[in-house]
Amino acid sequence: MKSLNNKVGFSSLNISIVLLILMISLLARYLVSLNGYSGQSKPPMFGDYEAQRHWMEITTNLDIHQWYFNSTDNDLMYWGLDYPPLTAYLSWVFGKIGEFIEPKSMELFTSRGYETDSGKLFMRMTVIVSDLFIWLPSVWFFVKTFYKQRNISQQISAFLFISLQPGLLLIDHGHFQYNGVSLGLGLFAITFIIRDQQLLASFFFVLSLNYKQMCLYYSPAFFFYLLLSNFEFTLKFSKIFSSIFKILKIGIVVIFTFILCWIPFLSIEQASQVLFRLFPFARGLYEDKVANFWCFISIIINVKNLFTTDQLIKICLILTLVTMLPLVYGIKRIPKNKFVFIHSLINSSFSFFLFSFQVHEKTILLVSLPISLLILHHPNMVWWFILISTFSMFPLLFKDGLVIPYFAIMILYIVIGYQFKNSITRSNNQFKHQNSQENLLASSDKSFYSIYLNYWFYLNIIGMVVCHLLYQFAPHPPHLPSLWLLLVCNFSFIHFILTFFYFIKEMTTFSPIKIKSN
């Protein structure tokens, strides 16, 4: 136990610092949770808060084989379960606890739209507890692994920056979701990759996929990294056999973990129904307006009218796969490199968000995670991207009545984060002289895009303020009801696409710096 504590860094921290970090993290979540949420007091469908509560109701009251099927007891048109089995299992656990604490909150049918103060407190606490046991430990584990050569103050700064991302706070503890669970499981997988513990990485990544299918955004990066880092292109039989054996072990772990998660749903009937619920292509190219490529070009070309749904699915698939080719090149060029791997996650998740079929505005959180992990290497870029990604979700947060916490968090983030990133930049100037392995990354923020951010920062802040004012107060032209919404989305998209190309350039021009195995 002592050696394990030393590895993850707990022994180097004073207990008071640990408690202070936890207090700050939990207090921020609690304060956000005091505000509105998705669909509050808006019958008959309410919103995501009711969806999560309803899943607890369904899993608590119905047999497990009825969870994903339409029936008189389970109307799939009313927030039918459409997440993978681990979400259902966690809903069952929370549902049983909720049933014990407040039975009426989980009664079948009669609990629809249940919004008592005690019920809301319980629901909010389930998200906070999930963060406490999954998201926050995963961030700390990553920081102590990836930034092990940094001093403790830099590690704490990185932990707070990653764990207190405004977008994730507002969506999970305001709007109401459990993204911290899927992202936390995914981050454990990322950290185990960095530690060269690939079997554990595979196990945790499959868990993240089985909690939320959107973690597929990371799957190409994991697949090609694991494949290309283990397979040696050689004519020696012994090395070929060794490569195949390594890949086979990973495959066994992946299959075993999937089977473990899907045990109740392994019949053809059950599995096909669950998959049908997980991938609802009938919903269309995107829901509402989202800051991606398809929404951007819709102001010029209405692709929904030009192509059928099947054609759009194929076009999206081709474009998404083509824009992922840089990650294959990057990993093949420098295999087993921690920086290339994180950049490949950025490439993969960005390609899905910008070009794939059926994208939600909240899925930008999947892009924000790998980008935020590079905070001590790209402080300017990371700080600005997290700001823009949160801004891109403003229309959704406005609809949820989260304007006050949104502006409070954004202002704090701009003021404190601006000073914070400058402090990191100064620390990097000292650190790069001490560690030749990370010299390139520590100084890589001195790029064209960094200069762009520094000189155009105030102009873009003004642009964001104008977008906010127009969206909230200016009447839209009668024939253009989505004008201000499109303005917010397209303003965000321009920054997203620039960031996308920036990190592709970084990944494909790295010097061959090899990561040392822990």
From Swiss-Prot:
Pfam families in the cross-refs: Alg6_Alg8
Compartments where located: Endoplasmic reticulum membrane
InterPro entries: Glyco_trans_ALG6/ALG8
rRNA-binding in keyword set: no
Residues that carry a glycan: 70
Membrane-crossing segments per the record: 8-28, 127-147, 174-194, 215-235, 247-267, 311-331, 339-359, 368-388, 396-416, 451-471, 484-504
Cytoplasmic side: 1-7, 148-173, 236-246, 332-338, 389-395, 472-483
EC class name: transferase
Gene Ontology terms describing biological process: dolichol-linked oligosaccharide biosynthetic process
Superkingdom classification of source: Eukaryota
E.C. designation(s): 2.4.1.267
GO molecular function annotation: dolichyl pyrophosphate Man9GlcNAc2 alpha-1,3-glucosyltransferase activity
Alphabetical keyword list: Endoplasmic reticulum, Glycoprotein, Glycosyltransferase, Membrane, Transferase, Transmembrane, Transmembrane helix
Catalytic reaction(s) noted: an alpha-D-Man-(1->2)-alpha-D-Man-(1->2)-alpha-D-Man-(1->3)-[alpha-D-Man-(1->2)-alpha-D-Man-(1->3)-[alpha-D-Man-(1->2)-alpha-D-Man-(1->6)]-alpha-D-Man-(1->6)]-beta-D-Man-(1->4)-beta-D-GlcNAc-(1->4)-alpha-D-GlcNAc-diphospho-di-trans,poly-cis-dolichol + a di-trans,poly-cis-dolichyl beta-D-glucosyl phosphate = an alpha-D-Glc-(1->3)-alpha-D-Man-(1->2)-alpha-D-Man-(1->2)-alpha-D-Man-(1->3)-[alpha-D-Man-(1->2)-alpha-D-Man-(1->3)-[alpha-D-Man-(1->2)-alpha-D-Man-(1->6)]-alpha-D-Man-(1->6)]-beta-D-Man-(1->4)-beta-D-GlcNAc-(1->4)-alpha-D-GlcNAc-diphospho-di-trans,poly-cis-dolichol + a di-trans,poly-cis-dolichyl phosphate + H(+)
Membrane topology value: Multi-pass membrane protein
A Gene Ontology cellular-component term: endoplasmic reticulum membrane
Pathway participation: Protein modification; protein glycosylation
Protein name: Probable dolichyl pyrophosphate Man9GlcNAc2 alpha-1,3-glucosyltransferase
Organism: Dictyostelium discoideum (Social amoeba)
Gene (name only): alg6
